[in-house]
């Protein structure tokens, strides 16, 4: 099986790396947080002293980092990773970043004889742990076919969105819609509650009606309506407000670059920005319900 280097062992990267180990891959890992590195090493991964050291002898390099700036620094800046990667290696970046950044890094990788895919994911930490992630891939079809067995060890659905950067664009579109959807659902549930409706009954009605949506079915923002969702544990865990705000910011950047109109996306961005500024940045994004409820 392929020798893999995995860089970035945070809330998403760590369970993804563990699933590769479970699938039998030889894994060398690196993270700037020593505790995260040590945890994967205990599970069978080989800890590297640096990112460049981790890619020595690797056939596939995977990164999962927080933002565009981190990906740029790793591959193009102070991380100096690209020169350390052997020609012919496949590079897969699973971070959610600006499409322009993905294109720039892929171009630099190609200049060094490397194939690179942008492969952001959907499914959250639960999907990462259960190996049911959706991979949204941009890059050459041949590179994707080479990556498919590895991605299949970490996820359930794999889509080829198009050329380099297309995976990021599709992911941004999806998350913009999700942010809008959650804010709208929170508003509808709050309206129903204010008018005397049982929110659980209202949710059941909407699930069987034209307002049906993913958030309503599996991620209800109202505490107590669903078990095992962030709303029923004080909005702890899940997908943070600040992460949603980051993705809505990426959508705004993409819209500006292409002169696309996203009025609802911008409104959602403003709402999550207000929510974050009020101290909710680390809470799950479904906590936008609290902002709606606080409005007078």
What are the roles of these predicted feature ranges?
Residues 1-64, 89, 94, 125, ...:
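NAD(P)+-binding Rossmann beta1-loop-alpha1 motif at the extreme N-terminus of oxidoreductases
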Residues 51-63, 67-115:
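Rossmann-fold NAD(P) dinucleotide-binding segment
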């Amino acid at each position: 099986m392929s020798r893999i280097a995995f860089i970035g062992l945070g809330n998403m990267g760590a369970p993804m790396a563990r699933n590769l180990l479970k699938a039998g891959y030889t894994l060398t890992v690196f993270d700037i947080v020593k505790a995260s590195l040590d945890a994967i090493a205990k599970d069978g991964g080989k800890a590297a002293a640096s990112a460049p050291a981790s890619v020595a002898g690797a056939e596939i390099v995977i990164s999962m980092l927080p933002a565009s700036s981190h990906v740029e620094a790793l591959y193009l800046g102070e991380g100096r990773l690209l020169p350390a990667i052997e020609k012919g290696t496949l590079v897969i970046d699973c971070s959610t970043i600006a499409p322009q950044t993905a294109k720039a890094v892929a171009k630099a990788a190609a200049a060094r004889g490397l194939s690179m895919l942008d492969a952001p994911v959907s499914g959250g930490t639960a999907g990462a742990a259960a190996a049911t992630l959706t991979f949204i891939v941009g890059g050459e079809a041949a590179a994707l076919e080479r990556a498919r067995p590895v991605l299949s060890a970490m996820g359930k659905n794999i889509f080829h969105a198009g050329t380099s950067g297309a995976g990021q664009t599709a992911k941004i579109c999806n998350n913009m819609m999700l942010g809008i959807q959650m804010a709208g659902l929170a508003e509808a549930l709050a309206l129903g509650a204010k008018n005397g409706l049982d929110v659980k009954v209202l949710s059941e009605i909407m699930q069987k009606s034209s307002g049906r949506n993913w958030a309503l079915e599996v991620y209800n923002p109202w505490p107590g309506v669903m078990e095992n969702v962030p709303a029923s544990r004080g909005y702890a865990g899940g997908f943070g407000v600040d992460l949603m705000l980051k993705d809505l910011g990426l959508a705004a950047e993409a819209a500006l670059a292409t002169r696309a109109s996203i009025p609802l996306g911008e409104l959602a961005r403003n709402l999550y920005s207000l929510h974050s500024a009020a101290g909710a940045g680390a809470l799950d994004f479904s906590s936008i319900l609290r902002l709606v409820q606080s409005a007078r």
